[in-house]
Amino acid sequence: MAGHSKWANIQHRKKAQDNKRGKVFTKAIREITVAAKLGGPDISSNSRLRLAISKANSSNVPKDTVERAIKKALGDKDQNIQEITYEGYGPNGIAVIMECLTNNKNRTVSELRHVLSKHGGSLGTKGSVLHLFKKVGIIKVLDTTEDELLSHMENIDLIDFEIIKDGCILFTDPNKLFEIKKYFEEKSIMVENEEITMDPITLINIDNMQQEKILNLSDKLEEIDDVQNIYMNVNLG
């Protein structure tokens, strides 16, 4: 259904961001802590925590580390972490969204502005690029052909899908992510991955030299401790 491979582009971005393994653990723990603090420790009623734990498991974060993060969230009443989304521009005018968790907003803004300006970009105002993306849920189901997927279409509500070598990638409303995951699990169809992401409405094509600059910017933004996720409307696939 997809005109271009959104999954390939997402995987390229994730691979670049996941190269720093220690940072992946830190991010996973921080997201679990914030999710538990905001919504409580019960995953049946806290979908954000359920998703955070699922992502931590995918990154091989030890179970006891996950449990400690939840306990810390419940016991540390003084930890004042804010969840803030910043918007900006990179080289060639590409749009950049930076999702952050921070206990010092001024520090975070300063670090983001410094990295963006050093790499030919700038920090934008609220709403400057957010409209160029849409929030979507993504589910990867294994060992499922297109015909098999089509047989389930009456029972699930999808925005889009892609057929890949080892299964299917499903794009859905974020609010229906766990409902669809549960549907497939009840059918004994293995779900390997689920997440919520910001999907660019239109991708900008770039050459190899431009891609190197943009990946370098992404790496430097990832090195900022407060940054959780980075999204760009550029074709990296």
Residue ranges and their predicted role:
Residues I138-G237:
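Positively charged, low-complexity, intrinsically disordered RNA-binding extensions
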Residues M1-G124, V129-I138:
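N-terminal cationic and glycine-rich segments that engage phosphates or anionic surfaces
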